[in-house]
Amino acid sequence: LMNCAQLNLEPNTPQELAYLIPYKDECQFQIGYKGFLQLVYRSGIVSSFNADVVYRAEVENGMFEYRKGITPTITHKVDLLHPEAREGELIAAYAACTLKGGGEGMLRLVDKKDIERAQKTSASLAANKKYGKDSPWISSPEAMWMKTAIKRLAAWLPQTEMLAMAVDLDDKSERGESQLVLP
């Protein structure tokens, strides 16, 4: 609960900002993607933020394009006449933001291999599978993919104490490590 209070994220609410999750003999604090978004906005660093997932059908139908480079760009079109393109196999997620004060936007794209690596190192996913419990990686994969992209982008943003603490606490939760905070 100390972590919730320090980050000012109320757990287990309909807002889905953060969660208190039983893990072994302690309670783990886990930040949802909406909680990370709130922390990024609260930092005062960004003026706009966007995150989404990409489905295979979107790429195959020319609805998604990613260009790498010094100034990477994403074009993600939505076809309202074919909503089925937003279903099926997930292949990537991204997070993008515009920094306050102008300058170039920032963008991070994580592909399926990156996501699978994040899943493999997730102690909570392994524990949930072992004990037959539902994991957000299973029940809400889109949210977990976006959260991974947001965390990757947050690591590249100018760091505030709150943002750095949030990433550290969530990483510890994913690895199943103690999140004990010393005063």
Predicted regions and their residues:
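Single-stranded nucleic-acid nicking/binding segments centered on His-rich, glycine/basic loops
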Residues: T148, P158-P183
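Short alpha-helical interface elements
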Residues: L1, E26, E174-S178
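Binding-interface segments
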Residues: M2-M162
